[in-house]
Amino acid sequence: MTSQAPPQPASSPGVAAPAAASSIPNLKDRLPKLEPRKRRSGPSNPTPIPETPALPTPPDTSSNWTFKTPSRRILSKKDHDIFLSSPTCKLVTAWVFGLAESIVDTPNSAIRDADLSALIKTILHILDETEQLVTKSPPNEQGGSRFGNKAFRGLLDLAQKNSAAWHHDIGVQNEDAINELSTYFCESFGNANRIDYGSGHELNFMIWLLCLYQLGLLKQSDFKPIVLRVFVRYLEVMRVIQMTYYLEPAGSHGVWGLDDYQFLPFLFGATQLLHHPYITPRAIHQDLTLEEFGHEYMYLGQVSFVNSTKTVKGLRWHSPMLDDISSARSWTKIDGGMRRMFVAEVLGKLPVMQHFLFGSLVPADDSMSEDTGAGDEADVEDDPHAGHDHTGKAHDGTGWGDCCGIKVPSSIAAAQEMKKRGMNQGLRRIPFD
């Protein structure tokens, strides 16, 4: 018998028969094709990283060389523009960047005492004696004031009196040369009239070292010790001076500045950490890393010092710019950023460079203005703008575009006064931190 298929049920009236399978649309074809999302590249900095110019050969000063007492020559924006395109600007840039490149991936301890030349040892001894002068000019009692202590002027007077003998020890015998170098050296510890200190004074110290190079006393073989021993010792001396005399920040940008006083520790420090295998930019938020490596790397050491001088805990509250920079992917990006900042925020800022001093070893362009004697030497104690070019400027004391920045008391003073009153149990936390 042949089997028969079961009878199909009859379609109900008014109900359509099911459509054939071939007529059902493939909804998969109607869905948009999934493609990998293209990640947006971060905003690139249109400003190229400044290159290191070639460092010129030192001039022959053995005969027929006329030394000059350094003076201000950047008295207007026009003078500043001339400076920025001058050989001297390239000389300063080559000097600072050349020193930075000499310490790539090199910690402070890499330079041993046995590696130091006699001149480097003498310079370190001079800095030791400078620190000892602090005890001979103790700070005046100011009743808890956070503004600069006038006893600082006594320290600078003592440094000036010792300067000639110190330069004889270095090997500078010409009295005119000593006068030129002493001006840079004494101006590297701060301004006596305003009782302040900033990146311009720090730059004066580097120019003093540049003058020693121009005289043929310092050699390129001394570059590493110059940064890792001499400059590091200078930082230590300046921290003692800042904490003793409550030096006011020169042209401070407040919390929106990189640091109240220093810049070069960050530039040199980023170069030291350029290819470090495990210390990343985020490490500045790790107290143990700062404690263990702060003495080896200037960047970490400066962050640690900044933390110790604040009354509030947390970089994002007291140093938001440092906090922002720590999000960079690598030290290479930070190194490039610090180079840009040196050119733009130090050499490129008139409020900083109007105090720059030009002599014979670091000369001014002939077309720049001559100093009429109304510079820092003629500053009036109660007038922080004395001797400055105010043509076309609105000096209302606000914002970053004014001549001298924002005049603020020392943050170091606040921390030191709290310690004197026994309030050093720990830093305050922001309530919503």
Swiss-Prot record:
InterPro entries, per the entry: Phstyr_phstse_ac, PTPA_C_lid, PTPA_sf
Extent of Pro residues compositional bias: 1-10, 45-59
Domain of life from the UniProt record: Eukaryota
BP terms from Gene Ontology: mitotic spindle organization
Gene Ontology CC: one annotated term: nucleus
Region (Disordered): 1-67, 367-400
Signal peptide: none
Biased composition (Low complexity): 11-23
Cellular location(s): Cytoplasm
Role description: PPIases accelerate the folding of proteins. It catalyzes the cis-trans isomerization of proline imidic peptide bonds in oligopeptides. Acts as a regulatory subunit for PP2A-like phosphatases modulating their activity or substrate specificity, probably by inducing a conformational change in the catalytic subunit, a direct target of the PPIase. Can reactivate inactive phosphatase PP2A-phosphatase methylesterase complexes (PP2Ai) in presence of ATP and Mg(2+) by dissociating the inactive form from the complex.
Keywords: Cytoplasm, Isomerase, Rotamase
Bias type Basic and acidic residues, positions: 383-396
Catalytically driven reaction(s): [protein]-peptidylproline (omega=180) = [protein]-peptidylproline (omega=0)
Gene from which this protein is expressed: RRD2
Record-given protein name: Serine/threonine-protein phosphatase 2A activator 2
A Pfam family assignment: PTPA
